[in-house]
UniProtKB/Swiss-Prot annotation:
It is found in: Cytoplasm. GO terms for molecular function: GTP binding; GTPase activity; translation elongation factor activity. It comes from Bacillus velezensis (strain DSM 23117 / BGSC 10A6 / LMG 26770 / FZB42) (Bacillus amyloliquefaciens subsp. plantarum). Catalyzes the GTP-dependent ribosomal translocation step during translation elongation. During this step, the ribosome changes from the pre-translocational (PRE) to the post-translocational (POST) state as the newly formed A-site-bound peptidyl-tRNA and P-site-bound deacylated tRNA move to the P and E sites, respectively. Catalyzes the coordinated movement of the two tRNA molecules, the mRNA and conformational changes in the ribosome. This is Elongation factor G.
Amino acid sequence: MAREFSLEKTRNIGIMAHIDAGKTTTTERILFYTGRIHKIGETHEGASQMDWMEQEQERGITITSAATTAQWKGYRVNIIDTPGHVDFTVEVERSLRVLDGAVAVLDAQSGVEPQTETVWRQATTYGVPRVVFVNKMDKIGADFLYSVGTLRDRLQANAHAIQLPIGAEDNFEGIIDLVENVAYFYEDDLGTRSDAKEIPEEYKEQAEELRSSLIEAVAELDEELMEKYLEGEEITIPELKAAIRKGTLNVEFYPVLVGSAFKNKGVQLVLDAVLDYLPAPTDVAAIKGVRPDTDEEIVRHSSDEEPFSALAFKVMTDPYVGKLTFFRVYSGTLDSGSYVKNSTKGKRERVGRILQMHANSREEISTVYAGDIAAAVGLKDTSTGDTLCDEKDLVILESMEFPEPVIDVAIEPKSKADQDKMGIALAKLAEEDPTFRTQTNPETGQTIISGMGELHLDIIVDRMKREFKVEANVGAPQVAYRETFRTGAKVEGKFVRQSGGRGQFGHVWIEFEPNEEGAGFEFENAIVGGVVPREYIPAVQAGLEDSLENGVLAGFPLIDIKAKLFDGSYHDVDSNEMAFKVAASMALKNAVSKCNPVLLEPIMKVEVVIPEEYMGDIMGDVTSRRGRVEGMEARGNAQVVRAMVPLAEMFGYATALRSNTQGRGTFTMFMDHYEEVPKSIAEEIIKKNKGE
């Protein structure tokens, strides 16, 4: 099947915003106008086309980025809907990674909100060109020019209006297009009919002013245009459009549009702006990768002629077809039924079927081309961030980096019979979401789940109940402590049981020493002359390794120690492996009084990004959490504080940071190293764990 839309006529865009700015409604209207939906679903009634997971419909927020394809004026527009809640930043990160451009939706009443800052920063990191849509112009308190101002003040963005609303709140009637210099009035409720008319008299002066400041702003980015402008020559509409496009593609300029998605006003003009100002796959820099065996850099251009390469950016379990892997094709073509190489994992994969998704309905296609976004059925080993490529021409594309989970919670099924079902459910959910982990705690046998925040784990537990019919009880968040020795000593372990019949006899002398941090447990056999027969040596090592798991102070694993077996004795009849295993564990217990054992806690490397005015409060808060501030720097108009803080003190930090900064602060943290717990705190933990 030949390519339906040329690369130049393809747009891969994301729609990004703060919670409640109207992002899902905007996407919904785009699908309506591009002829994909027959009835419009409202988010507040819980029936939107993109929000297709039940929890999203209940909570009225978008959690998973569904990829949808639409057509407008002979172009193909692939849309990825991204969530706006801070606990789902991984979803935003991964969708930005595969997009070429984005539409940032703002609420006309509030302008730039906290999460807009976070998403905007992420988009800047990935160099994503953006157009801005100031939505909800029909809302009480809507103020377009104030919203444009917040883009400049809070984000230092070179943003300029390319439209002007006619009226506001209930009187919002139409839109003035400053580029074409015409006005659009909406005549029917669906906003499908809007006629271009002359700009009303009372708006002419303001429109003229805004148009000249727009021309001046783009002229600054384009020398030829600047000369024309300074000489007072007329700048034509095509020249102005080309200059806006150039500035937008270079991520130096952000055109701002206006409307009300809910009232069907301005959405078609947003679609026009996507075609006019956002990049085609051929406008963005070619993607770089490395050859798996030699690590030499390879460039893949957006072209059907190049070898196939794609990035898997989302894995989902679908109720009808099983595992769906969403991927973005960067180069080459792929037919369904063919084999590809997952170069990240070194596995061969068969692509069973290829589906193009439309929110929650789907269409099967036989071939995908460079620049396309689609979902594959049948991939067994591919997870988020993996590269899929031609078997004969391997490449690993720059992968996505995901933050480490920051919160651990113990979970158990409400009925014991569901234990296995819960294990399967958690494994499937972990496959979909790289920031969600699941493990079994060897000391307590509990299942521990880890994620990006409380809402994140709530949703996981919720999905388990809905999709896998497993109900669970969730515990309070916990910290993974460790133990180690600070000094060395020679210790004896003797196990003797000789009372009639076959006895038990095992006797060892072991020298314990602290090992380097991160070196783990090392065992050395220094027996000479067979005082402990060779066949019992592995039993001594096994006995030590088993006992290390449960520590000596408070039942946490003992790490980073050396053990040298140097002497002992045996009995011809009564000695056996079991006896030496027990003797070794007794030696470890006896080491407690001589080797100065201490408790270690995970120390997190924390990075907090906040507006300058909250600097003092945040520094004080970090210090009160036993944190050490390691450094500070300015990033745009925000301040970054880097610190080392014990994980035990970081519980509830997301909530505290939100309230300390009115939701404008964000933070990331990951495990850095283990450090000794201060004595007074260690005593408390030991008491608690021994049940005293």
